[in-house]
Design a protein with these regions (language model features):
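Adenine-nucleotide phosphate-binding core of ATP-dependent small-molecule kinases
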Residues: 40-46, 50-94
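C-terminal charged capping/lid subdomain of soluble metabolic enzymes
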Residues: 118, 136-142
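Conserved phosphate-binding/catalytic loops in two-lobed NTP-binding clefts
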Residues: 93, 110-130
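Buried hydrophobic packing segments
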Residues: 7, 81, 130-135
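A short helix-loop
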Residues: 2-63, 140-142
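Alpha-helix C-terminal capping segments
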Residues: 56, 84-85, 105-113
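Glycine-rich phosphate-binding loops at beta-strand->alpha-helix junctions
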Residues: 90-109
Length: 142
Protein backbone atom coordinates (compact mmCIF):
# COMPACT_ATOMS: atom_id res chain seq x y z
CA UNK A 1 0.00 0.00 0.00
CA UNK A 2 2.81 2.37 0.85
CA UNK A 3 4.44 1.86 -2.56
CA UNK A 4 1.13 2.48 -4.31
CA UNK A 5 0.47 5.68 -2.35
CA UNK A 6 4.01 7.00 -2.74
CA UNK A 7 3.92 6.36 -6.48
CA UNK A 8 0.51 7.98 -6.78
CA UNK A 9 1.69 11.09 -4.97
CA UNK A 10 4.73 11.28 -7.29
CA UNK A 11 2.31 11.09 -10.22
CA UNK A 12 0.19 13.91 -8.79
CA UNK A 13 -2.72 11.75 -7.64
CA UNK A 14 -4.78 12.51 -4.55
CA UNK A 15 -3.91 10.54 -1.40
CA UNK A 16 -4.86 7.77 -0.73
CA UNK A 17 -3.90 6.86 -4.27
CA UNK A 18 -4.99 3.23 -4.73
CA UNK A 19 -8.18 3.68 -6.79
CA UNK A 20 -6.71 6.46 -8.96
CA UNK A 21 -3.49 4.51 -9.58
CA UNK A 22 -5.55 1.49 -10.62
CA UNK A 23 -7.58 3.57 -13.09
CA UNK A 24 -4.36 5.03 -14.48
CA UNK A 25 -2.79 1.56 -14.85
CA UNK A 26 -5.83 0.37 -16.80
CA UNK A 27 -4.95 2.95 -19.49
CA UNK A 28 -1.54 1.36 -20.11
CA UNK A 29 -0.99 -1.13 -22.91
CA UNK A 30 2.47 -2.12 -21.63
CA UNK A 31 3.00 -5.58 -20.16
CA UNK A 32 5.77 -6.13 -17.62
CA UNK A 33 7.49 -9.34 -16.57
CA UNK A 34 8.77 -8.68 -13.07
CA UNK A 35 11.10 -10.85 -11.02
CA UNK A 36 10.42 -9.84 -7.42
CA UNK A 37 13.16 -9.45 -4.83
CA UNK A 38 12.33 -12.32 -2.47
CA UNK A 39 13.93 -13.92 0.55
CA UNK A 40 11.72 -16.86 1.42
CA UNK A 41 8.19 -15.52 1.76
CA UNK A 42 9.44 -11.98 2.40
CA UNK A 43 9.75 -9.39 -0.34
CA UNK A 44 11.39 -6.02 -0.75
CA UNK A 45 9.75 -3.33 -2.84
CA UNK A 46 12.34 -0.59 -2.23
CA UNK A 47 13.94 -1.29 -5.61
CA UNK A 48 10.57 -0.67 -7.25
CA UNK A 49 10.47 2.81 -5.75
CA UNK A 50 13.91 3.50 -7.22
CA UNK A 51 12.68 2.26 -10.60
CA UNK A 52 9.66 4.56 -10.36
CA UNK A 53 12.00 7.53 -9.88
CA UNK A 54 14.10 6.48 -12.89
CA UNK A 55 10.99 6.02 -15.03
CA UNK A 56 9.70 9.45 -14.02
CA UNK A 57 13.04 11.05 -14.90
CA UNK A 58 13.05 9.21 -18.23
CA UNK A 59 9.63 10.64 -19.06
CA UNK A 60 7.68 7.37 -19.04
CA UNK A 61 3.93 7.77 -19.32
CA UNK A 62 2.17 7.93 -15.94
CA UNK A 63 -0.14 5.07 -16.98
CA UNK A 64 2.87 2.87 -17.73
CA UNK A 65 4.48 3.72 -14.39
CA UNK A 66 1.23 2.86 -12.62
CA UNK A 67 1.06 -0.47 -14.48
CA UNK A 68 4.71 -1.18 -13.62
CA UNK A 69 4.02 -0.63 -9.91
CA UNK A 70 0.94 -2.87 -9.88
CA UNK A 71 2.79 -5.54 -11.87
CA UNK A 72 5.59 -5.37 -9.30
CA UNK A 73 3.18 -5.72 -6.38
CA UNK A 74 1.44 -8.61 -8.14
CA UNK A 75 4.74 -10.39 -8.75
CA UNK A 76 5.73 -9.93 -5.10
CA UNK A 77 2.40 -11.26 -3.83
CA UNK A 78 2.60 -14.25 -6.17
CA UNK A 79 6.15 -14.92 -5.00
CA UNK A 80 5.03 -14.81 -1.38
CA UNK A 81 2.20 -17.27 -2.00
CA UNK A 82 4.49 -19.62 -3.94
CA UNK A 83 7.03 -19.55 -1.10
CA UNK A 84 4.33 -20.33 1.47
CA UNK A 85 3.01 -23.19 -0.68
CA UNK A 86 6.54 -24.57 -1.09
CA UNK A 87 7.03 -24.62 2.67
CA UNK A 88 3.56 -25.57 3.93
CA UNK A 89 1.71 -27.09 0.98
CA UNK A 90 -1.43 -25.83 -0.73
CA UNK A 91 -3.13 -24.00 2.12
CA UNK A 92 -6.45 -22.19 1.68
CA UNK A 93 -5.85 -18.52 0.93
CA UNK A 94 -7.55 -15.43 2.29
CA UNK A 95 -6.53 -12.11 0.76
CA UNK A 96 -7.36 -9.05 2.87
CA UNK A 97 -6.30 -5.45 3.32
CA UNK A 98 -6.49 -2.26 1.34
CA UNK A 99 -4.36 -3.43 -1.57
CA UNK A 100 -6.80 -6.30 -2.14
CA UNK A 101 -9.50 -3.82 -3.19
CA UNK A 102 -7.47 -3.37 -6.40
CA UNK A 103 -9.29 -5.26 -9.15
CA UNK A 104 -6.13 -5.80 -11.23
CA UNK A 105 -4.35 -7.52 -8.33
CA UNK A 106 -7.47 -9.46 -7.31
CA UNK A 107 -7.93 -10.82 -10.83
CA UNK A 108 -4.29 -11.85 -11.19
CA UNK A 109 -4.17 -13.54 -7.77
CA UNK A 110 -7.52 -15.25 -8.21
CA UNK A 111 -6.46 -16.58 -11.62
CA UNK A 112 -3.15 -17.84 -10.26
CA UNK A 113 -4.26 -19.27 -6.90
CA UNK A 114 -7.99 -19.01 -6.28
CA UNK A 115 -8.58 -18.01 -2.70
CA UNK A 116 -11.17 -16.01 -0.82
CA UNK A 117 -11.51 -12.25 -1.23
CA UNK A 118 -13.78 -9.90 0.67
CA UNK A 119 -15.80 -7.61 -1.61
CA UNK A 120 -13.67 -4.62 -2.70
CA UNK A 121 -15.70 -2.24 -0.53
CA UNK A 122 -14.78 -4.30 2.54
CA UNK A 123 -11.14 -4.84 1.56
CA UNK A 124 -10.07 -1.37 2.60
CA UNK A 125 -9.77 -2.59 6.18
CA UNK A 126 -7.82 -5.61 7.41
CA UNK A 127 -10.56 -6.18 10.00
CA UNK A 128 -12.94 -7.25 7.24
CA UNK A 129 -10.47 -9.91 6.13
CA UNK A 130 -10.07 -11.14 9.67
CA UNK A 131 -13.86 -11.37 9.98
CA UNK A 132 -14.08 -13.44 6.78
CA UNK A 133 -11.34 -15.72 8.08
CA UNK A 134 -13.15 -16.13 11.40
CA UNK A 135 -16.38 -17.00 9.58
CA UNK A 136 -14.59 -19.60 7.46
CA UNK A 137 -12.95 -21.12 10.54
CA UNK A 138 -16.26 -21.31 12.40
CA UNK A 139 -17.86 -23.16 9.45
CA UNK A 140 -15.01 -25.69 9.49
CA UNK A 141 -15.58 -26.31 13.20
CA UNK A 142 -19.29 -27.05 12.74
Amino acid sequence: GQLIDRTGVRLGLQFPCGPALEQLALQSRVSYKIKPSMQGANCSLSGVENQVDKRLQAGDAPADIARFVLSSVSAALKGMVQAVFAEYGQLPLLFAGGVMSNTILRQELETAFGGVFAPPALSCDNAAGVAVYAALCSKELE
